Amino acid sequence: MTIKSILAPLTNATAKGFPLDTALLVANALRAHAEVLFIKEEVRENTRMALIAAGRPEVQDALRQLAASTRQEQESGHRLARQKFDDLLARHRIDYRENSIPGDLPSAFWRVASGTAIDEIEQHGSAYDLIVVARPEENVASQPIVEAALFGTGCPVLVAPPKPPKVIGEHVMIGWNQGVPAAH
């Protein structure tokens, strides 16, 4: 199987790990196109909390402040992750473009989505040859992302190591459930 398209889903919680570094390293090594998908997870107000807050201005104010703080953290995390992406492109000399050009040099693109990481990965992940995710033991928040990639797409998944590798492919572990979706 030739790997020419790579998806690297990131959220605020997983951007501090190394899936971005690993995805761009793989793209560079395989002359592939990596799409980094930064998912701004929606701030959802808990219905039960909203009902409890009904008629209590102090609780409503606290919920509004929490939602505003979460949105601010999302924006800050997005800016930091995008800066890291731009720095890595320059360091690895990877072209920034929306689509790959067959047989060309490695390339990468940054896309932003709103929603949940699980939904985005399950909806779009199967369109890629490889999905690179953060290691769940290092980042508990990445566990649902790993599961969505593994079980929701049928695509090969590369779990990024806890530290960015200097080279890719020296140590490899393959897991396969012999299911039809995993056989492609």
Question: At which residue positions do the language-model features occur?
Answer:
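Structural beta-alpha unit
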Residues: 1, 43-44, 52, 69-131
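Small/aliphatic-rich secondary-structure junction motif
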Residues: 1-67, 164, 168-184
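Gly/Ser-rich helix-loop-strand patches that form or flank binding pockets
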Residues: 16, 20-22, 110-112, 118-165
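Short glycine/serine/threonine/alanine-rich loop segments
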Residues: 32-33, 94, 155
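Short secondary-structure transition/capping segments
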Residues: 53-55, 80-90, 143-155, 183-184
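Acidic/glycine-enriched edge-of-secondary-structure segments
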Residues: 106, 145-148, 170-176
